[in-house]
Amino acid sequence: REICLPVGLKEIGDWAFAYCSNLKKVVLPKKDILLGRGIFKECEALTDIPHLGETGIRAEQVGKLLGAVPTKLEADYLFSPKEAGERVWLSRFDDRLREFLETPDEDGYTKMVYCGEEDIVANMDLYLAERRRAKSRLCFLRIMNDTELSEDFREKLKEYLVSHTKGCASQAAWEVAFKEHGNEQDYYEAFAKVGCLTEDNYDAILSEMGESYPEMKAYLMRY
């Protein structure tokens, strides 16, 4: 679930941690490292790649952002332990996230079908729903780890989440918060703070929560 690599590390070979489905955290030294192919392929649980020996809120947030690069952001060129957290790197991260949000949801579907992945993508509707959840996950991630986040881009992230909240044609933002992070208050706090909890969907949200996560339900009722 967690690996800490030493400061003397020089290289990570091809497929080093590929298919480690339970791997959640990898601590890396902030230095140039020769990186092989597919290091974290199919490591779906991986969410945190902090720098060795660094502490504090900024360091924690950078670890979360770097952790998203190999598994969620589809941008191998951003996986640079040495550059991660620098202002230029954060700007490039946001540029890639902006590009991802602006990419039509249907992009990539035909390619996956041609590659024989019909069993994974049963139909277009399921594919589109997952793409919107993927975008919502990254919007939440960046808003909750907002080091060097510009106000203009913050508004764009908020707009995406609000347009995919409970009651919208796509409820991806609510699905991510409730179904994937049901007992994590940070997500409910972000969900409510950006404007996803409204007078129009308040009752429907509490109704869907039912008896699940009573503390989180109480939090929303107090908000």
What are these regions (language model features)?
Residues 1-11, 21-34, 44-149, 157-182, ...:
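Structural signature of tandem-repeat unit edges
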Residues 14, 205-207:
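N-terminal cationic amphipathic segment used for targeting or macromolecule association
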Residues 182-183, 212:
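Ankyrin-repeat interhelical turn detector
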Residues 190, 195, 207-223:
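Charge-dense, extended regions
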